[in-house]
Amino acid sequence: MATTPVSLQVDGLAEREVMMVTYSFNQATDVEGQMSGIPRGGKITIRVKALNDGNPDLLNWMIAPNLAKNGAIVFNETKSGNLMKKISFTDAYCVDFVELWEDKMGHYEEIVLSCREITNGSVTYTNEWA
């Protein structure tokens, strides 16, 4: 079974091959299931294949507390290479970084981004940060 080519593209950083991506939104409810809060979200977890060239871009982003970046996770069709889906993020801060190498499992880096804005197609979610 073929896999979908997915890449992480961030302003000023080398493009990376995505192994896993997850993001979610939630809305608080009361004990009866009725909405009691506004939708919340804006964090994206992304696992990428390590470049294995000593490139510390993602780590540098993590340890720079005021460094916001824009970018996208791009999903392309396997056969044609045409754009299938794009998740864009604006004013994203890297708030978690893990690098792991495991024998027979490979070498990867995993980051968590806290984003002011996430866009998936025609849907945009904006965190109203002060």
Predicted feature residues:
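Glycine-rich, low-complexity intrinsically disordered segments
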Residues: 1-130
